């Protein structure tokens, strides 16, 4: 995706910080059998939380990031992490995956969406909402959550650069059956917050804001 403003803000001005102390405080209390990391990227969440779970499923479709993710897992001897080099979405098959043009950052802003609105809220120093239009893309395998995971998950984290609702649609079976105990979603458009709350409240989740920007919402109790 050719959006140098996003790259400049995220990595140089730190306006889009990937980690939040408040989030880690919440997550560090959780223990369980399975953590599903949707949009694992280089494995920050997967690796850091892996000691708290028997199994971690890390979903990452970026063909440049996957080898680095596997290397990081190997270097830290995290044998309970399984990497799935596919994108979770609302269907099964192949799809265009639009690339972050700044290869030096290994595509942290890659997305299944060709048009991606970034409007996360009151981030410190952030300018007005802006939209990215994908130019370069690769074909990647996609699948629904329901087609990939049958067991119950103690925690599901979703960070997929605007494609959050496609992932949730593809997980409707697991949500219906109560096979997702806790969920955390990084929402990239604050105008969609009410939709997120509405969808997840149907399944009994009581979401709360987990960071001060706001962009991360979850039900972690």
What are these regions (language model features)?
Residues 1-221:
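Phosphate/nucleotide-binding beta-alpha loop and adjacent structural elements of enzyme active sites
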């Amino acid at each position: 995706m050719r959006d140098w403003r996003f790259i400049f803000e995220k990595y140089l001005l730190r306006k889009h910080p990937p980690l939040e102390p408040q989030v880690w405080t919440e997550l560090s209390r959780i223990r369980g059998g399975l953590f599903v990391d949707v949009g694992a990227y280089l494995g920050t969440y997967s690796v850091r939380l892996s000691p708290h779970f028997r199994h971690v499923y890390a979903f990452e479709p970026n063909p440049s990031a996957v080898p680095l993710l596997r290397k990081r897992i190997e270097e830290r001897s995290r044998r309970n992490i399984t990497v799935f080099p596919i994108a979770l979405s609302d269907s099964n098959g192949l799809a265009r995956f639009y690339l972050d043009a700044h290869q030096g950052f290994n595509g942290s802003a890659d997305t299944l969406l060709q048009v991606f609105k970034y409007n996360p809220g009151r981030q410190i120093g952030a300018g007005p909402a802006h939209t990215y239009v994908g130019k370069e893309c690769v074909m990647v395998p996609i699948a629904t959550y329901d087609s990939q995971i049958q067991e119950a998950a103690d925690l599901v984290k979703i960070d997929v650069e605007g494609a959050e609702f496609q992932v949730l649609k593809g997980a409707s079976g697991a949500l219906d059956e109560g096979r997702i105990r806790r969920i955390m979603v990084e929402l990239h458009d604050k105008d969609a917050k009410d939709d997120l709350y509405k969808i997840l409240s149907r399944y009994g989740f009581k979401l709360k804001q987990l960071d001060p920007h706001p962009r991360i919402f979850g039900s972690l109790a």
